[in-house]
């Protein structure tokens, strides 16, 4: 495997969305269907830095920073999932994206799947990895992270850990990559959240993960898009790693059998942030898959 690059060689782009500025990467040719890359918690478009160069020679690549994250503005919001839905919906409309191919991860997957379910005629394909799905019981949450995430979802304790101690950036992120992240990479991920006041999204997201039936509104929403995925013929490309976190190998095998029109790719060793362990394979497989989309 080639050395994993730490640089972010993309010019900044900004668009006003609901009165706030959202930052995004925008590279590649303007003709054809754009590829929309959606990150999750606690990352940004930086997560896609080594994947986009594989796709940009043939397709327009757009990678926003979710509101309150990366280089996007940080308005005073509760940062519920519905807040991110509003801003992402408006972002897609502001850029005039009629049809897209989605490349999605973590909470970006929930946002992407939810958008696709509501706009199926505008989705040409979905590439996904380590995505948000219903977790029926805490026993099915990875053991190494169980106590940590239970603490995150305990009112005052969770806020102290994530807001005051920055535990999602300093703890969860590096522990969910097989290789050691460099200080340069860690500093890129730290930069948007140097001030505790800016860490609200990092705290809200783990409290919205649909585990053991809570929170009920997110469980219902995620179950709805999972039902849609199991019925939709849209081409799907699922990346998985070993041991994985949200999508362990056994779950990937089940999904390969149950999802229509789904190709799977084993990236080898990987935890949650697969893009940091094998970006070249992910990027090259997306680039190989795209020409086959109708």
UniProtKB/Swiss-Prot annotation:
Keywords: Hydrolase. Residues 34-158 form the AB hydrolase-1 domain. The keyword Hydrolase applies. One of its GO terms (molecular function) is haloalkane dehalogenase activity. Its EC number is 3.8.1.5. The active site is at residues 106, 130, 272. Belongs to the haloalkane dehalogenase family. Type 2 subfamily. This is Haloalkane dehalogenase.
């Amino acid at each position: 495997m080639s050395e994993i690059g730490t640089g972010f060689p993309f010019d900044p782009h900004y668009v006003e969305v609901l009165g706030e500025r959202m930052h995004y990467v925008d590279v590649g040719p303007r003709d054809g269907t754009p590829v929309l890359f959606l990150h999750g918690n606690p990352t940004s478009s930086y997560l896609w830095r080594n994947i986009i160069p594989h796709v940009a020679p043939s397709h327009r690549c757009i990678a926003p920073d979710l509101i309150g994250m990366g280089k996007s503005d940080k308005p005073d919001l509760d940062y519920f999932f519905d807040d991110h839905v509003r801003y992402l919906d408006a972002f897609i409309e502001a850029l005039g994206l009629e049809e897209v191919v989605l490349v999605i991860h973590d909470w970006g997957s929930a946002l992407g799947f939810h958008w696709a379910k509501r706009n199926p005629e505008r989705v040409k394909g979905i590439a996904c990895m380590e995505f948000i799905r219903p977790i029926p019981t805490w026993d099915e949450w990875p053991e190494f992270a169980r106590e940590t995430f239970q603490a995150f979802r305990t009112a005052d304790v969770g806020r102290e850990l994530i807001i005051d101690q920055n535990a999602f950036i300093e703890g969860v992120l590096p522990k969910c990559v097989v290789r050691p992240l460099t200080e340069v990479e860690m500093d890129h991920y730290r930069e948007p959240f140097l001030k505790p006041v800016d860490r609200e999204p990092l705290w809200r997201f783990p409290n919205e993960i649909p585990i053991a039936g809570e929170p009920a509104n997110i469980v219902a929403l995620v179950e709805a898009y999972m039902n849609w995925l199991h019925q939709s013929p849209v081409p799907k490309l699922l990346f998985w790693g070993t041991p994985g976190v949200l999508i362990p190998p056994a779950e990937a095998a089940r999904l390969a059998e149950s999802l229509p029109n789904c190709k799977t790719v084993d990236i080898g060793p990987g935890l949650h942030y697969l893009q940091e362990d094998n970006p070249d394979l992910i990027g090259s497989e997306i680039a190989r898959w795209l020409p086959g989309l109708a």
